[in-house]
UniProtKB/Swiss-Prot annotation:
The gene is Gnas. It is a peripheral membrane protein. Residues 1038-1045 are annotated as: G4 motif. Residues 946-954 are annotated as: G2 motif. This is Guanine nucleotide-binding protein G(s) subunit alpha isoforms XLas. Keywords: ADP-ribosylation, Cell membrane, Coiled coil, GTP-binding, Magnesium, Membrane, Metal-binding, Nucleotide-binding, Phosphoprotein, Transducer. Residues 745-772, 837-863 form a coiled coil. It is found in: Cell membrane; Apical cell membrane. GTP binds at residues 797-805, 947-954, 973-977, 1042-1045, 1116.
Length: 1144
């Protein structure tokens, strides 16, 4: 049928369910399609727009009955907003199936509150006359506001129109009334104007099974566009003349709307049409001949309110849309309906005539033979929006038809069917050639079964077809001329596709299953018993897509005159071939009507004959062509209810099923079918294989393994193959394979062994790792306990106070020292007592000797007054010492010891040493200078007294671990980090105690960094900062007043008085609790207690009771003194440790 699609300006793809606004949507002019409208005897389309029928003019319907009524004003319909829609049965009790409803949404952009109404003729009781609109009502530009319908239908994305218009907005447009041509070619045209009542309150329908949100399946969408120039054609579905779109003002499409009832007037000279019923045609038409052979009740086509609106989201240009029914809208240009035969006629025709039609004796309408052009859009070639129009030869039946003069020439010569890229099937009546084997699709051009023509494939493919296919096509094409040459005495008796011969049936059935070219592209099933006959699954990427259950028989497969009888297996093969067929444009289910069920057996037989002829014609096709598939979607629930699925036929005997048709078991079976090495197709093995045998074949099958190694390796499998393999015809083959003498080892068994071995190794590794983890955890626990039981001691003090000497004494006393005396035996002590460590100390001792003599000689000239040599002959010795002062890596030759010994014996050098408080001299200078004769020996080994006195500048952090009476001590010496003390001091906030070392004899000395700062004053300042440090406020301090031997020497010498550096000493008296050493001079006792009280004054002045100061008088170089002092401190340290962990 002809149709005119109207889309508003803003109805683009992706704008779904957007209600129109007043002045929002630009209106579009109707586009002029290619060709002219079918000529008629009556007034033309332009005249009909201005002509009103007389009041008593009869309005013939489809069933040879006239409805006459008094004239009624169209305003009466406008004023009845609650008028209900009544469904009138076709042929007495016909209700159109759900899939025949219009898949479009008709929206009036600016008609205000006017809605289309259904005109019910005859006995329905509703107004039956043709009512004319007031021109003001039809104007879309009426500023009354657009309101979306309450029951408006919004199509899903796949059912929207596959094209979009972008037209400039116009102000006022006048929409012409609907125009319906005569039933027969050349007849007068009747126009039907519609009145738009107010918006009805209830738009539901009772018997059609629709809801207000009904969504038809995608295969019923429109597969072509109307823009002839841009989209490749403007022809209607076959059998109907082309629509002539009316071009309005400004180039905009007017919105088309029509009531559900169409009252059509036939031509006066129209030949009678035999219309048995409304079922059985591939396309339902809105017209019937008034000259029926028998009288039936008035037929009214009832359908839901349809709206042509914007395209939904996700709609492409190649979306398939059903064209079973003409798109009828509320207002718009006329829709022309030709006198093509009716699809539904086949279901209700008399048994004799239906039998004659099934055997191929039905006359062919002359109109069906004059279709000349069919566009072809091959996959992968060209754009879907610009298909190529292929000119083909008209069928010979066009010349022999007796009524060909009455046919519409324009509809026969200019009808162009635009087919989407997914429609690859064809129905060529007289194929001049076959499509090339390399193409993706089967026949790349196909016409509609009821289109009145059977176009052939393009002539360009003649070079590519095979000779066998051409030879098969010629004899099969001869019978087509015989039934086609008969005069069309009954133009609507039977569509041309029902009388298509063998060649036509082959094309209608889609692809050929035998050649594997199109395994899933057979025709739509000829029997409704096939639930998936609507279309095959779409693509291999969509294996779950199933066919529409409500498919019906393709009418092209209805009659094959030249087909011979077929066996049951052949018929089953034809049914299977039809099951996997491509989408047949316009095919729909008829199982909802009883009349259709009556004709199912005859259609099944016709489908079998059609499949047989199809295999004969396509025998020469290549099997390498890729299959073409149509993108489909499962039907809506309404269609499934209308057409319940019927039992599925037996599996088709195709050579290799397509990917989306094979399940998991089929794939496994084909992969394992090579174990018997049967060099044949899978036709025999596939049919005989059962689920048990498939399980047997794939039991030990692994992906990626060669098939030759899957037999003979498993005894259980061999047993099943020998015991039950005879049921499948594979026992001998399996036995021969399993008993082959040169059989290699099964790689799967080797792989399993390797995997077991690796698993065992992995378990052993895990066990070892677990054991190691437990050992690590145990070690961590032990270290944690040791850490908690260890007394950590931090050594702090000013430079050259003797901290390193204390550490050395601890090693000597408690770590077996350097000579193995006075400590505990352990491995660490043994390593520290090695001769290698003592050897390294020899170089340090020599460096101390060299540094001492160089410092004294250099100070002789720098002191004020300078000191002269007692023996001037030793001047060259002084020059030698000064010359080697800055020599790195000095090797200490014998002359060095000779010059050093001579200078040390000089009285002037001794006098300079007495003034050592005026310059920086190491404390061990006198000790090592007195032992020059011992140190210069080559086999010199330092003694335990030499090692503590060795002076090495501390430049880092040194730690020493020792144990006293099974109590662990960890001592840290950080004396070399004086400048950055504030940055690292907080790291020792968890130590047990702080041992602060003070050089008591340094009261008359300056620090090495600054010659103006007194060393003892520097020690007092450092002690105060440590005592008041916020990180160390809870840590007690053990004060070591070191170098008591040197202090006694200075006090007794009287050369450097303490009151000269600390005036407070002059007023200081010895405390009563002072305990002097045996034989100690009282002056020495007074001096050492003065220094002690200076530090205690700082601790008591800022003490808060959380930490205490414990002073001790020590001599770091005296090992016994350090032992006694440290023993006294052990009790204090342990008490501090218990208080630290809150145990005391």
């Amino acid at each position: 049928m002809g149709m005119l699609n109207c889309l508003h300006g803003n109805n683009m793809s992706g704008q779904h369910d957007i209600p129109p606004e007043v002045g929002d949507q630009p209106e579009q002019e109707p586009l002029e399609a290619q060709g002219a409208a079918a000529p008629g005897a009556g007034v033309g389309p332009a005249e009909e727009m201005e002509t009103e029928p007389s009041n008593n003019e009869p309005i013939p319907d489809e069933t040879d009955s006239e409805v006459c009524g008094p004239p009624e004003d169209s305003k009466s319909d406008i004023q009845s907003p609650s008028q209900a829609f009544e469904e009138v049965q076709v042929g007495g009790d016909y209700s159109p199936p759900p899939e025949e409803a219009m898949p479009f949404e008709i929206q009036q952009p600016s008609l205000g509150d006017f809605w289309p109404t259904l005109e019910q003729p005859g006995p329905s009781g509703t107004p039956s006359g043709i009512k004319a609109f007031n021109p003001a009502i039809l104007e879309p530009g009426t500023p009354t506001g657009a309101h979306p319908g309450l029951g408006a239908y919004s199509p899903p994305p796949e059912e929207a129109m596959p094209f979009e218009f972008n037209e400039p907005a116009q102000e006022d447009r006048c929409q012409p009334p609907l125009q319906v041509p005569d039933l027969a070619p050349g007849g007068p045209e009747a126009w039907v104007s519609r009145a738009l009542p107010a918006e009805p309150g209830n738009l539901g329908f009772e018997n059609t099974g629709f809801r207000e949100d009904y969504s038809p399946p995608p295969e019923e969408s429109v597969p072509f566009q109307l823009d002839g120039e841009e989209f490749g054609g403007d022809s209607p579905p076959p059998g109907l003349p082309r629509v002539t779109p009316q071009i309005g003002i400004g180039g905009e499409f007017p919105t088309v709307a029509v009531p559900s009832t169409l009252c059509l007037a036939p031509a006066a000279n129209a030949p009678p049409l035999w219309v048995q019923g409304a079922i059985g045609r591939p396309f339902r038409e809105a017209v019937r001949s008034p000259n029926f052979a028998y009288d039936i009740s008035p037929m009214e086509i009832t359908r839901p309110l349809l709206e042509i609106g914007r395209a939904s989201t996700g709609v492409d240009d190649d979306t398939a849309v059903n064209m079973d029914s003409p798109p009828i809208a509320s207002d718009g240009p006329p829709i022309e309906v030709s006198g093509a035969p009716v699809k539904s006629e086949h279901a209700k025709r008399p048994p004799l005539e239906r039998q004659a039609a099934e055997t191929g004796n039905s006359p062919i309408s002359s109109t069906t033979a004059e279709e000349a052009k069919v566009p072809s859009l091959e996959r992968g070639e060209g754009s879907p929006t610009q298909p190529e129009t292929v000119h083909i030869k008209p069928a010979p039946v066009a010349e022999s038809g007796t009524d060909s003069s009455k046919a519409d020439p324009d509809s026969a010569t200019h009808a162009v069917l635009q087919i989407g890229p997914e429609e690859v099937g064809g129905v060529p009546t007289m194929p001049t050639d076959l499509p090339p084997a390399s193409e993706d699709a089967g026949p790349d051009v196909r016409a509609e079964p009821d289109g009145g023509t059977a176009p052939a494939t393009p002539a360009e493919s003649e070079d590519n077809r095979e000779p066998a296919a051409a030879a098969a096509a010629e004899p099969a094409a001869e019978p087509a001329a015989e039934p086609a040459a008969e005069p069309a005495a009954e133009p609507a008796a039977e569509p041309a596709a029902e009388a298509v011969p063998d060649t036509e049936a082959e094309s209608a059935s889609g692809a050929v299953p035998d050649t594997q070219e199109e395994p899933a592209a057979a025709a739509a099933s000829a029997t409704p018993a096939e639930p998936a006959a609507r279309a095959a699954p779409v693509t291999p990427t969509e294996p779950a897509t199933r066919a529409v259950p409500s498919a019906r028989a393709h009418p092209a497969a209805g009659a094959v005159p030249g087909a011979s009888a077929m066996s049951a297996a052949a018929r089953a093969a034809a049914a299977r071939a039809a099951y996997a067929g491509p989408l047949v444009w316009g095919a729909r289910s008829l199982s909802a009507t009883p009349a259709a069920r009556a004709s199912l057996p005859a259609r099944a037989a016709a489908a079998a004959r059609a499949a047989s002829a199809a295999r004969a014609v396509a025998a020469g096709r290549s099997a390498s062509a890729a299959p073409s598939r149509a993108h489909l979607r499962p039907p809506s629930p309404e269609i499934q209810v209308a057409d319940p699925p019927t039992p599925r036929p037996a599996p088709r005997p195709s050579a290799w099923p397509d990917k989306y048709e094979r399940g998991r078991s089929c794939c496994r079976y084909e992969a394992a079918s090579g174990i018997c090495e049967i060099e044949s197709s899978s036709d025999e093995s596939e049919e005989g294989a059962t689920g048990c045998f498939q399980w047997l074949l794939r039991r030990n099958r692994r992906p990626g393994q060669p098939r030759s190694h899957t037999v003979g390796s498993n005894p259980v499998r061999n047993f099943f193959a020998r015991a039950f393999g005879s049921c499948f015809g594979l026992s001998e083959c399996t036995r021969s394979r399993s008993l082959s003498p040169g059989k290699a080892k099964d790689p799967m068994e080797e792989r399993r062994k390797q995997m077991r071995k690796e698993a065992m190794e992995m378990r052993e590794q895990k066990r070892a790792d677990k054991k190691r983890s437990k050992l690590i955890d145990k070690q961590l626990e032990e270290e944690k306990m040791d850490y908690m039981c260890t007394h950590r001691l931090l050594l702090l003090g000013a430079g050259e106070s003797g901290k390193s000497t204390i550490v050395k004494q601890m090693r000597i006393l408690h770590v077996n020292g350097f000579n193995g005396e006075g400590g505990e035996e352990d491995p660490q002590a043994a390593r520290s007592n090695s001769d290698g460590e003592k050897a390294t100390k020899v170089q340090d001792i020599k460096n101390n000797l060299k540094e001492a003599i160089e410092t004294i000689v250099a100070a002789m000239s720098n002191l004020v007054p300078p000191v002269e040599l007692a023996n001037p002959e030793n001047q060259f010795r002084v020059d030698y010492i000064l010359s080697v002062m800055n020599v790195p890596n000095f090797d200490f030759p014998p002359e060095f010891y000779e010059h050093a010994k001579a200078l040390w014996e000089d009285e002037g050098v001794r006098a300079c040493y007495e003034r050592s408080n005026e310059y920086q001299l190491i404390d061990c200078a006198q000790y090592f200078l007195d032992k020059i004769d011992v140190i210069k020996q080559a086999d010199y080994v330092p003694s335990d007294q030499d090692l503590p006195r060795c002076r090495v500048l501390t430049s880092g952090i040194f730690e020493t671990k020792f144990q006293v009476d099974k109590v662990n001590f960890h001592m840290f010496d950080v004396g070399g980090q004086r400048d950055e003390r504030r940055k690292w001091i907080q790291c020792f906030n968890d130590v047990t105690a702080i041992i602060f070392v003070v050089a008591s004899s340094s009261y008359n000395m300056v620090i090495r960094e600054d010659n103006q700062t007194n060393r003892l004053q520097e020690a007092l300042n450092l002690f105060k900062s440590i005592w008041n440090n916020r990180w160390l406020r809870t840590i007690s301090v053990i004060l070591f007043l070191n170098k008591q031997d040197l202090l006694a020497e200075k006090v007794l010498a009287g050369k450097s008085k303490i009151e000269d550096y600390f005036p407070e000493f002059a007023r200081y008296t010895t405390p009563e609790d002072a305990t002097p050493e045996p034989g100690e001079d009282p002056r020495v006792t007074r001096a050492k207690y003065f220094i002690r009280d200076e530090f205690l004054r700082i601790s008591t002045a800022s003490g808060d009771g959380r930490h205490y100061c414990y002073p001790h008088f020590t001599c770091a170089v005296d090992t016994e003194n350090i032992r006694r002092v440290f023993n006294d401190c052990r009790d204090i340290i342990q008490r501090m440790h218990l208080r630290q962990y809150e145990l005391l």
